[in-house]
Amino acid sequence: MATPAAPRTISFADNNDNQPNQQQRGRGRNPKPRPAPNNTVSWYTGLTQHGKNPLAFPPGQGVPLNANSTTAQNAGYWRRQDRKINTGNGVKQLAPRWFFYYTGTGPEANLPFRSVKDGIVWVYEEGATDAPSVFGTRNPANDAAIVCQFAPGTLIPKNFHIEGTGGNSQSSSRASSNSRNSSRSNSRGGRSTSNSRGTSPVSHGVGSAESLAALPLLLDLQKRLADLESGKSKQPKVVTKKDAAAAKNKMRHKRVATKGFNVTQAFGLRGPGPLQGNFGDMNYNKFGTEDPRWPQMAELAPSASAFMSMSQFKLTHQSNDDKGDPIYFLSYSGAIKLDPKNPNYKKWLELLEANIDAYKTFPKKERKPKTTEDGAVVASSSASQMEDVDAKPQRKPKSRVAGSITMRSGSSPALQDVTFDSEA
């Protein structure tokens, strides 16, 4: 299918799939497709809201499955459609319906990505971009609505029903009717030519060349979904000594903590010191960015631009190295406003309360003193909090604190008021 130069839109109008039979008998083998309606129609069946709670998805969830899309394309918005009916006793409000549209398509095609507007809920997959989508307008006269499906693990809001599944016989019957019409058209020897504008999320026609070409992709998608449900989606990653050494050789503030290179290995023990971090419970310290809560945690982290533009910086001369060259530390501080109107506001507070200063509750781990052959006791030395820092501040006598971690009780006065530090 030819791709227009300009981004295409998915049309959604009143999202009503009750169209007359597009294939009428006696019109030849290749009936002319009906033109697309003026209004836009979603590619997917909608979500019916049966309660007062608004639609909301956790970050990284809420985009319907699409066999023809890439991760970068999986972003868009859900739009609320308020409904009412005139009765003998006046106007009666019906349950609202929500329909999905890709970014840059549908009734809100000109709405910038993640713009705040009543009745609009933005969703995206991790790694998606804010570029307008290439998926075009669906012509309901030629294409049946795709029953909305989500990736395993997606948390569908309470009191929301996916149309076309379960007891929604009306939507299911419409989809079945359109499917029979398409099959009847192909059985007469012709292939239904879609008049939908732009790329379709699915291939058209039963047994068509497009369907056969997409079959391996659909089978692969089915296998991936089955693997996700069975927990076999990822092979265990083996971290070799070479990989660990390479990760450790990175500058401290450029490292990424994972299960194979955990938070303590990457950034040191949690604690109150000026060169220590105080964020992270036992689970986060073990898994790092592989913690299931990481997507919500990452939303609180500023971007590189925000970090450089919102922070108060201070350059401090700490000491000199063996060659006499000065060693500097770049100290920074700042603040992030937590918006109570954000749907993840309560989740953020839960995460912060569970992870800030969580090291104070870590279980104590006693160390057995080493003994020599003559029975003398040798005190064991603790690991440095900053193995990659060549020169360290002058220390006062070491003392034991919670968690049996040997901490520095004193440091350079210039760093006493700094919460986090990074090497310049």
From Swiss-Prot:
Q: How is it modified after translation?
A: ADP-ribosylated. The ADP-ribosylation is retained in the virion during infection. Phosphorylated on serine and threonine residues.
The molecular function terms in GO held by this entry are: RNA binding
Q: Which domain of life is it from?
A: Viruses
- Stretches with biased composition (Low complexity): 13-25, 168-200
Spans annotated as Dimerization: 251-360
Which stretches make up the CoV N CTD domain? 240-363
Q: Which Gene Ontology CC terms are recorded?
A: host cell endoplasmic reticulum-Golgi intermediate compartment; host cell Golgi apparatus; ribonucleoprotein complex; viral nucleocapsid
Q: Name one Pfam family in it.
A: CoV_nucleocap
Keywords for this protein:
ADP-ribosylation, Host Golgi apparatus, Phosphoprotein, Ribonucleoprotein, RNA-binding, Transcription, Transcription regulation, Viral nucleoprotein, Virion
| Domain CoV N NTD, first and last residues per copy | 39-164
Tell me the subunit arrangement: Homooligomer. Both monomeric and oligomeric forms interact with RNA. Interacts with protein M. Interacts with NSP3; this interaction serves to tether the genome to the newly translated replicase-transcriptase complex at a very early stage of infection.
Q: What does the protein in this record do?
A: Packages the positive strand viral genome RNA into a helical ribonucleocapsid (RNP) and plays a fundamental role during virion assembly through its interactions with the viral genome and membrane protein M. Plays an important role in enhancing the efficiency of subgenomic viral RNA transcription as well as viral replication.
Protein family according to the UniProt entry: Belongs to the betacoronavirus nucleocapsid protein family.
Q: What is this protein called?
A: Nucleoprotein
Protein source organism = Bat coronavirus 133/2005 (BtCoV)
- Which gene produces this protein? N
